[in-house]
């Protein structure tokens, strides 16, 4: 039922169902992780962070929890060194994962390390040409004065997933449409 609600973007209802399930089984790291992801969708960022930290305590090898927490910090441009450490731990647990590599590239960009960000994001995009990775890679290219290549990457991302929120928001924010 939660999956159906997620697919139709009924985040609040999905969150409530997961919350009820987690009351019955409070130490289920996977359910807590799912609830954390729904908390983020309904802008309960503090709750998301608490839930992800609980997941990490319960299941220290849960790479996606480290990545989600680190990415959330990086995306909000807060506690960037902590974000980098969390994402680096996720990458240790699942080396080569393009989504985690994307997150590390994003935090490096937020830290002002554009060359390292570009290297990581190019690698992630080459492995998995995903629209969200395209959004991040394009933004780094844009910031480095490579607008034509950024537009090309974004166009590829739109072809793959025209409705991707991160890509759409990036283009609007940078006035790059």
Language model: regions and residue ranges:
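Bacterial c-di-GMP phosphodiesterase catalytic domain signature
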Residues: 70, 124
């Amino acid at each position: 039922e939660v999956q159906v609600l997620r697919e139709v973007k009924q985040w609040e209802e999905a969150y409530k169902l997961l919350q009820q399930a987690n009351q019955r089984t409070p130490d289920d790291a996977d359910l807590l992780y799912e609830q954390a992801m729904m908390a983020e969708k309904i802008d309960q960022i503090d709750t998301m962070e608490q839930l992800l930290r609980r997941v990490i305590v319960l299941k220290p090898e849960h790479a996606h929890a480290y990545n989600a927490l680190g990415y959330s910090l990086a995306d909000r441009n807060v506690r960037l060194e902590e974000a980098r450490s969390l994402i680096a731990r996720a990458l240790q647990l699942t080396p080569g994962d393009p989504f985690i590599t994307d997150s590390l590239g994003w935090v490096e960009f937020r830290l002002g390390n554009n060359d390292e960000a570009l290297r990581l994001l190019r690698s992630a995009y080459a492995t998995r040409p995903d629209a969200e990775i395209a959004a991040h890679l394009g933004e780094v290219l844009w910031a480095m004065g490579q607008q034509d290549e950024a537009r090309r990457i974004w166009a590829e991302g739109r072809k793959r997933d025209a409705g991707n929120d991160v890509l759409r928001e990036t283009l609007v924010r940078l006035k790059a449409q």
